């Protein structure tokens, strides 16, 4: 029997109901209490996330054990927002208590191990057996109770720094205690977060004493740990074969070795509440000791500003959770000496992708009134524009490099730019540089640019070849392109038409009548061709893609996919009212699930109902039936537009997003996943925190509120 108990939303919304007494974390959205060890052990699939505005993060599970290679108490960004290094994997805590009855050794941490011969999962040490409560909010907090002794561990990341603090309080030592010592043993890999460490080929770790602590160096990276309340004792050791079940499920290498350089030892005094802080920082310099309180205050002020912009969109618990969730993805990025902004596509493994950034920007930045960051994000990608293309993504390791293999990122850039100007009324930035960047995109698409992106004679955009993957359905593995969508893709041309009409209106407003007339002419041509090429009279939905073979013969892919929903959801649609309604009906009947839209209907012969297995198997399912939560935004907006924003349409749109809100405030621990299985019960998968999933929920809630 699962003996974990989650508090209800009404309980959580009242800080007085905090587990174990009051809490100062007003952003707390989740709390669990446990009756025994099984309750905690059953929650190894519940993951929490902390971020700090730089691309650094901390991530782990409710019981405290790591189940992925990407988990750690500090995964720092060596070259923000990328270059992620696992600086501190875990901390093992132990209290030795000497009383008149003898010595008692109490373990609090835990790791997972897997017996290959029997398949048995073992927790060592079994610290999770003492876990009484867990809280998730701006910080994460575990509370352990053993024989009247209470140890509380709280983790916080330092705002805009590559550092963290792990704070402990210990109370309740036996009155006949002769001697009690807290031992804290850091477990370290100091490796790229995509890789794994093996003792056999790890190379040497250098352990060097510093004031109040230790500096550990491995190859080109270092981490410094300090603790004013204790002394560090060097005693190097290794823990072997830590097991990562989530890697095992993905059919990846699933074991790792941890280096332990020694331990901090802190003398405890009976009858007192003892507080101990361990500061962790990437590099050879210790974390500033004053940063814990100042960073907490700065982050709180920052979050309150965001919350004020969205607090009327739903109830208090939901808007608090959305405030923190939305903020997790907005980070700094340095471009040409300027501190600009960008959006991390997803945690733990994604960096900032152009497509994801500009789909997510309206929800994460405009709905939340973060107009300065929105402007800096548009600038970051405009600065790297090449041939009218914004980057598909920045390189993870070379800060000066960018990759441009996308046909839709630039059109989403235009979409985000138009929305930014509309909502911020920032005329000066449009006239200074943004308007020109937007027009550069449209002109490049019209005249032709890289990756065979060009406007055809019919006014529609064609792109790519059989060997390229330029749309968001871009999965390929071992030379297999799973969703070939070269030629004229339906959502690309819906975005193209919307961009032409919207930009024509903007440039006309600012005195560029000739350019406005030209874009309007292109839009009219595209509209006529779109209706002729994409409307499928037989099925009463839109064709997904049309392309020419090497002999010039046209091929039509009439597969029902969610891409067509953009032709019904964007502000400027090339379709009439009846066809927009028909699209909504087809998508609702065949693709809609509680957690988003399927990428294929279940009756399609290429449908994959489970997103699982090896990389090849997962890539094969990625856009072949897998559900994407972000698509709930375009779907619900199409519902609103098809229903003329009526009361019934608003109710239907809100009903569509309710399951995701429950996921956010329930099993998602304040986040929304990248994908879900196409088949019920629609298990979540991919990244546990995805920017556009959160962003589209926020954008939709405001659309409904303003309707």
Where are each of the predicted segments found?
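Terminal accessory carbohydrate-recognition/targeting modules of carbohydrate-active enzymes
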Residues: 1-314, 348, 355-356, 366, ...
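Non-catalytic C-terminal accessory modules of carbohydrate-active enzymes
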Residues: 115-139, 146-150, 447, 585-595, ...
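Aromatic-rich carbohydrate-recognition surfaces in CAZymes
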Residues: 172, 197-200, 268, 274, ...
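Extended, well-ordered alpha-helical scaffold segments
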Residues: 183, 289-310, 318-322, 369-383, ...
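Solvent-exposed loop and edge beta-strand segments that line ligand/cofactor-binding
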Residues: 259-264, 340-357, 397-410, 478-494, ...
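Conserved oxyanion/phosphate-binding beta-strand-loop segments in alpha/beta enzyme cores
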Residues: 302-347, 376, 380, 464, ...
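Catalytic cores of carbohydrate-active enzymes
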Residues: 391-392, 446, 453-456, 497-611, ...
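A short, charged helix-loop
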Residues: 466-484
């Amino acid at each position: 029997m699962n003996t974990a108990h989650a508090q209800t939303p009404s309980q959580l919304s009242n800080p007085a109901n905090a587990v174990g007494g009051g809490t100062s974390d007003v952003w707390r959205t989740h709390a669990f209490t446990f009756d025994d060890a099984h309750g905690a052990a059953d929650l190894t699939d519940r993951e929490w996330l902390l971020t700090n505005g730089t691309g650094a993060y901390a991530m782990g599970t409710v019981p405290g054990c790591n189940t992925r290679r990407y988990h750690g108490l500090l995964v720092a960004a060596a070259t923000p927002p990328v270059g992620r290094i696992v600086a501190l994997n875990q901390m093992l805590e132990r209290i030795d208590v000497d009383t008149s009855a003898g010595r008692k050794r109490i373990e609090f941490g835990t790791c997972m191990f897997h017996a290959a011969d029997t398949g048995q999962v073992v927790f060592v040490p079994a610290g999770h057996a003492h876990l009484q409560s867990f809280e998730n909010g701006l910080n994460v907090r575990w509370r352990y109770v053993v024989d009247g002794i209470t140890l509380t561990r709280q983790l916080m990341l330092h705002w805009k720094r590559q550092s963290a603090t792990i704070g402990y309080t210990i109370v309740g030592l036996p009155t006949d205690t002769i001697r009690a010592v807290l031992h804290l043993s850091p477990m370290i890999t100091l490796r790229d977060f995509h890789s794994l460490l093996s003792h056999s080929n790890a190379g040497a770790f250098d352990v060097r004493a510093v004031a109040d602590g230790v500096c550990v160096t491995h190859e080109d990276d270092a981490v410094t740990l300090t603790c004013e309340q204790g002394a560090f004792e060097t005693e190097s050791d290794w823990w072997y074969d830590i097991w990562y079940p989530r890697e095992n499920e993905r059919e990846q290498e699933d074991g790792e070795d941890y280096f332990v350089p020694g331990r901090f030892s802190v003398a405890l005094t009976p009858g007192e509440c003892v507080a101990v802080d361990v500061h962790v920082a990437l590099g050879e310099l210790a974390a500033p000791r004053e940063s814990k309180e100042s960073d907490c205050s700065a982050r709180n002020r920052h979050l309150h500003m965001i919350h004020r912009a969205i607090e009327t969109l739903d109830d208090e618990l939901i808007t608090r959770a959305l405030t923190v969730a939305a903020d997790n993805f907005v980070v700094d990025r340095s471009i040409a000496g300027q501190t600009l902004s960008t959006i991390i596509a997803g945690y733990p493994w994604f960096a900032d992708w152009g497509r994801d950034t500009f789909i997510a920007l309206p929800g994460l930045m405009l709905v939340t009134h973060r107009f300065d960051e929105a402007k800096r994000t548009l600038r970051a990608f405009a600065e790297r524009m090449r041939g009218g293309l914004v980057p598909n993504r920045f390189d993870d390791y070379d800060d000066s490099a960018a990759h441009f293999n996308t046909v839709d990122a630039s059109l989403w850039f235009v979409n985000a730019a138009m929305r930014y100007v509309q909502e911020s009324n920032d005329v000066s930035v449009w006239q200074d540089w943004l308007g020109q960047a937007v027009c550069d995109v449209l002109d490049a698409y019209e005249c032709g640019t890289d990756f065979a992106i060009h406007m055809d004679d019919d006014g529609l955009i064609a792109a790519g070849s059989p060997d390229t993957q330029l749309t968001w359905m871009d999965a390929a593995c071992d030379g297999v392109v799973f969703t070939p969508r070269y030629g004229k893709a339906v959502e690309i041309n819906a975005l193209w038409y919307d961009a032409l009409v919207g930009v024509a209106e903007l440039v006309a407003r600012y005195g560029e009548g000739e350019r406005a007339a030209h874009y309007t002419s292109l839009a009219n041509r595209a509209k006529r061709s779109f209706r002729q090429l994409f409307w499928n009279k037989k099925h009463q939905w839109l064709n997904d893609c049309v392309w020419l073979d090497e002999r010039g013969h046209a091929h039509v892919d009439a597969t029902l996919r969610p891409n067509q929903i953009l032709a019904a959801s964007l502000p400027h649609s090339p379709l009439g009212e009846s066809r927009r309604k028909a699209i909504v009906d087809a998508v609702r009947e065949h693709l809609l699930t509680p957690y988003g839209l399927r990428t294929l209907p279940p009756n399609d012969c290429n449908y994959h109902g489970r997103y699982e297995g090896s990389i090849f198997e997962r890539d094969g399912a990625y856009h072949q039936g897998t559900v994407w939560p972000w698509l709930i935004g375009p779907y619900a907006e199409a519902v609103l537009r098809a229903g003329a924003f009526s009361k019934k349409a608003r109710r239907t749109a809100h009903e569509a997003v309710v399951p995701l809100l429950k996921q956010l405030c329930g099993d998602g621990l304040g986040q929304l996943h990248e994908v879900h299985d196409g088949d019920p019960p629609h298990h979540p998968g991919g990244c546990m925190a995805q920017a556009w999933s959160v962003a589209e929920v926020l954008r939709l809630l405001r659309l409904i509120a303003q309707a």
